[in-house]
Amino acid sequence: MAKATKPADLRAKTAEELEALLIDLKREQFNLRFQRATGQNEGQARVRTVRREIARVKTIASQALKKNAVGAGAPAAKS
C-alpha cells in the first residue's frame, strides 16, 4: 500500500474487505518490525503510516458495526 487510504474509500468497503485489508496491513507491519529488528529497514515513515492505516481501518469497522447494531436493535414503529 503506497498511499494512505481515505476514510471515504474505507466506508465504501464491505466488512469482509475491511477484514482482508486489516490482515494485509498487520502482515506488512510484522514484516516492517522484523526488518527493523534485523537492521534492514531504511524507511521509518512506512512503519508509522502502516500503524495509522491499521487504526483507520479498525475505526471504520467499529463505526460500521455500531451503526448496524443501532439500526437492528431499534424498536419497530407503532401503528
Swiss-Prot record:
UniProt keyword Ribosomal protein present: yes
One Pfam family per UniProt: Ribosomal_L29
Residues making up the signal peptide according to the UniProt record: none
Any one annotated GO CC term: cytosolic large ribosomal subunit
GO BP term, pick one: translation
Record bears the keyword Glycoprotein: no
Keywords attached to this entry: Ribonucleoprotein, Ribosomal protein
A GO term, aspect molecular function: structural constituent of ribosome
Family of the protein in this entry: Belongs to the universal ribosomal protein uL29 family.
NCBIfam families named in the record: L29
Protein's recorded name: Large ribosomal subunit protein uL29
Species annotation: Gluconacetobacter diazotrophicus (strain ATCC 49037 / DSM 5601 / CCUG 37298 / CIP 103539 / LMG 7603 / PAl5)
Record lineage: Bacteria, Pseudomonadati, Pseudomonadota, Alphaproteobacteria, Acetobacterales
